[in-house]
Amino acid sequence: MDVVNQLVAGGQFRVIKEPLGFVKVLQWVFAIFAFATCGSYNGELRLSVECANKTESDLSIEVEFEYPFRLHQVYFDAPNCRGGTTKVFLLGDYSSSAEFFVTVAVFAFLYSMGALATYIFLQNKYRENNKGPMMDFLATAVFAFMWLVSSSAWAKGLSDVKMATDPENIIKEMDVCRQTGNTCKELRDPVTSGLNTSVVFGFLNLVLWVGNLWFVFKETGWAAPFLRAPPGAPEKQPAPGDAYGDAGYGQGPGGYGPQDSYGPQGGYQPDYGQPAGGGGGGYGPQGDYGQQGYGPQGAPTSFSNQM
């Protein structure tokens, strides 16, 4: 019990909610329905033979047949209207297609159960070295092909079984029914709805296994080289160098450098550092407005270059 509890506790049951595990559950269930509806079939037909001599007639002849539909081994006793009976055998052997269909269904059932247990309890081993998904994909592809072949073969085989067990066709092959004065009638056809259902489940399994190929294929990683990453955001182009000068703001000629506003080449440059007795002009005590400030020698010093 401890081992079971550990397995249950360590199981990743959420995989059943994912497409990979959920489809595997459907495959397991539909495989059961496929081989159960075909392998457990048991049919019966009825007919009557009425002889000219009423005492020799048999008005209720029952003929039973079942899986695997070796009809050539099925017979019934019919009156020959001459005081005796004759063994009448059905025609055909359709066991190959029926047994092939059931065999594929049984193996699909077993594989689905094993794969589902691996998904839940051995997820790490399944993904180790990517071997598990690769083997799973190959097995799924094989089973998809086998479902196609077996379902198609069984659909044809079922059509032949219906023809061989049709009371009208059986009556046509009976010698006693061709004799004058004798009357043969069909009383009941065999019910083959279960066999029809088995064919439907066969093709449903085909759809499930083919569809599951995509989910298993994604687990293999083979699709990674074909998946392109979404394009990234385009890089922002730098502004042209001559938009605001080659050197930028405050970095030399051509920009918006503050050094030229009051630079050495011109501008308002009052000399506040001259001594009081200096003769350089300005507002010193030795000069007035007629000598140095606005003399005929030229314009004021502060505007000599800019004006």
From Swiss-Prot:
PROSITE patterns reported for this sequence: MARVEL, SYNAPTOP
Q: Does the keyword Plastid apply?
A: no
Q: Give positions of region: Repeats, Gly-rich.
A: 248-298
Q: Which InterPro entries match?
A: Marvel, Synaptophysin/porin
- Record localization: Cytoplasmic vesicle, Secretory vesicle, Synaptic vesicle membrane; Synapse, Synaptosome
Primary location recorded for the protein, binned into one broad class: membrane
The residues on the Vesicular side of the membrane are 44-100, 156-193
Gene Ontology BP annotations: regulation of neuronal synaptic plasticity
- Phosphotyrosine: residues carrying this PTM: Y75, Y272, Y289
Enumerate the transmembrane spans: 20-43, 101-124, 132-155, 194-217
Which ranges sit in the Cytoplasmic compartment? 1-19, 125-131, 218-307
UniProt PTM comment: Ubiquitinated; mediated by SIAH1 or SIAH2 and leading to its subsequent proteasomal degradation. Phosphorylated by SRC.
Q: Which residues are glycosylated?
A: N53
Membrane topology summary: Multi-pass membrane protein
Record's GO cellular component terms: neuron projection; presynaptic active zone; synaptic vesicle membrane
On whether Transmembrane helix is a keyword of this UniProt record, the answer is yes
Pfam families reported for this sequence = MARVEL
Q: What is known of its domains?
A: The calcium-binding activity is thought to be localized in the cytoplasmic tail of the protein.
Q: Which family does it belong to?
A: Belongs to the synaptophysin/synaptobrevin family.
Subunit (UniProt): Homohexamer or homotetramer. Interacts with SRCIN1. Interacts with VAMP2; the interaction is inhibited by interaction of VAPM2 with SEPT8.
Name recorded for this polypeptide: Synaptophysin
Q: Can you name the source organism?
A: Spermophilus citellus (European ground squirrel)
